[in-house]
Amino acid sequence: MVNWYLHNGSVYRNQIIKQESVLILGGLIVAFGEAADEARQLFRGPIRDFDAGGQLISAGFIDLHTHLREPGFENKETIASGTMAAVAGGFTTVCPMPNTNPALDSLEVFDDLAKRIRNNAHCKVQPIAALTQGRQGTKTVDYKGFKARGVVLFSDDGDPLDENVAEEAFVGVGEVGGVLINHLEDKALIGKGFFYEQIPPESEYLMLRRDLELVRKTRCRYHVAHVSAWQTVELITKAKAEGLPVTAEVTPHHLTLTYEDIKEPRGHFQMKPPLRTEKDRRALVEALNSGVIDIVATDHAPHGTEKEQGLFDGSPFGVTALETTFRSLYTELVLKGTLSLERLLYSLTIAPGAILGVEAELKVGVRADVVVLDLIQEKVITKELFQSKGTNSPFIGRTLQGWPSLTLVDGCPVYAHAGEVYTC
């Protein structure tokens, strides 16, 4: 069913929330408010009347930093399981990083991945291509070829861009109008220690300082991944004031947790960059509020059951996040008054859509990528709730509020929380 009449709910559009209905016909949004109500009365075709019961209706979320693990690491996640986790979390578009096996570094690999996506994805998937072949940092990829395939974002995620090839990569990505994402981690500064001591903030902000010089020189669009340190925020603030083409993201775990929340050294708190101090966390929240940080990105990095009992030493980095992102931020920030609901929704829809170059707002005539959010329901996070193969979440055992109840992609129902079965 691609015809829907969503009524008795609040709608987030034009960056405000107000009570109105939404009419979707043929997978397109055709009317809001009184116009939607009147058109529904005149429509004689098959349609699903959905009583939102006071819930919030928003454009589907967009994640610019996901790890779907396929091909090569299907024991951790697959396109099918990862995108099912996405729609369960309210995401209708995800951008998977290229740290797969093989890496997404050639058009042949891209074509194979595109086929897998067509056959298995539950939502829209916009792959991120590698910056260098094999993500080895020595030889750049065919940026023009990838751009012709519709790729916008380029990254060697997990591996910082080597000094010897950095300028060539910035020039190449800039020439095709792409966006370069670098993993900010100066490995020369990585040491030994526990929690955040092992990967100091200097490893992040000093590499960003280098990259910003290349942005000044090349004018390449640049996106700062998973900001974690207050010093990094200061550099981004100055770069934006200077007019550099820079955007930035922050993860839900860095917005809501610090190293002090780690009560025992379990592997599901192991992440890059690490959880830092309360000063850092507050700086990140303030930066998201002010627009210095543009978007929330999940950095969803499932590792399957092999990580669950792991200690920090030897445990792989990354946490499962697609299904807890909205819930954790709504619970820990919105309900506590440190972030507005409108700003949270903006950072998950309009802002990432602008970076990716896709429509991400509820408007007449656009494809109906929609999520309906129950802001009242709360549940304790357990392993059994996850659609993802990974349950390595720092929110296990926490009570979170704000759950997607329905997710539509092009008007097709891809997720219903209460167990209703809809057909497209």
Region roles according to the model:
Residues 58, 107-124, 171-182, 324, ...:
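Alpha-helix-loop-beta-strand connector modules within alpha/beta enzyme cores
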Residues 9, 22, 27, 54, ...:
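Divalent metal-coordination and catalytic microenvironments
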Residues 53-117:
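Metal-associated gating/positioning segment near the N- to mid-region
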Residues 9, 311-314, 364-424:
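C-terminal cap of metal-dependent C-N hydrolases
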Residues 196-198, 202-219, 289-290, 294-296, ...:
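His/Asp/Glu-enriched, well-ordered alpha-helical/loop segment
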